Amino acid sequence: DPLKLCLNVENLFVALKGGVSTNGFVSGDFLKALGKDGIVINISRGSVIDENSLLDALENNILSGAGLDVFENEPKINNRFFELNNVFMQPHQASATIKTRKEMGELQFQNILNYFETGSPLTLVPELN
C-alpha cells in the first residue's frame, strides 16, 4: 500500500509513468503521511503529483521540501513555487546523461529519415495519429 509506505519514510522519490492511471497519484494524503520532515522528489511526470496539494503542504510546513524536475503545466510553472525557499527546481533534465542524449538524437534522426522514406515517423505521437 503506497500510502502506508509514506507513513514509514521521510523521502519519497517519484518515478511513475504519466497517464490517466497515475494522474494525481501523489495526493495530499500522501504528503501528510510523509510528515514535516518529508521530502518529495519528482522526476517522472508533473501530472503524477497533485500540485495544489503539494504547494499547500510546502507553504504550510506540512512537508519539509520538494525537488522537482517536472511540473503539471510545463512550461507554465505555477508562480507559487517561485515564492518558496523549500523547493529545488530544475528544467526537466533528469534524463540528461550523455548516453540518453545521444539516443534521443539518434531517435530524432531515425524519425525524420523514416518519415521521408515511408511517410510516417517511427514513434508517432498518439494525438497526431
State where each predicted segment sits.
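Rossmann-like adenosine-cofactor binding region
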Residues: D1-R80
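C-terminal helix-to-coil terminal segments
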Residues: E74-N129
